[in-house]
């Protein structure tokens, strides 16, 4: 399978690359940054483009992924030191990525979120029907990202999974 990973360099994405390659998948990486030359494990092809690049659709069509995994909450391209700025950048990048994916209907899109969206105390086990309740800006941004994905799943018929 062709797997497209979207995210900045780090131990998590590198471990995913190793695992996917070991399972025999062809792994591609879109770094999300045009200028930084980051260190990734060996992949079939690395694309150094920002998520808001006009070439994003062409890259995705060229890779023709069976699965696209956006590192999301674990993407090292987002620093979150200036939360309001990162909130806008994160949600607009996700929108650009999803819009670019509307052209190819065959792949599964996976967004990595975080348990940070469930802040607070819960008496019962948290199931799929429990609404997220994050209070901090980063948590609210991740909740908004999940809702954007739900919108694309429902209105565009995309195969989207949020983990």
Residue ranges of model-derived segments:
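Conserved Rossmann-fold NAD(P)-dependent oxidoreductase catalytic core, especially the SDR/UDP-sugar
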Residues: 68-70, 95-137
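NAD(P)H-binding glycine-rich loop region in Rossmannoid oxidoreductase-like domains
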Residues: 49-89
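Conserved catalytic-core motifs of eukaryotic protein kinase domains, centered on the activation segment
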Residues: 40, 78-85, 120-124
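Glycine-rich NAD(P)-binding loop of the Rossmann-fold in SDR/ketoreductase-type enzymes
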Residues: 82-93, 132, 136, 140-143
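Active-site Tyr-X1-5-Lys
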Residues: 120-122, 135-161
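Conserved glycine-rich Rossmann-like NAD(P)H-binding loop of the short-chain dehydrogenase/reductase
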Residues: 25-34
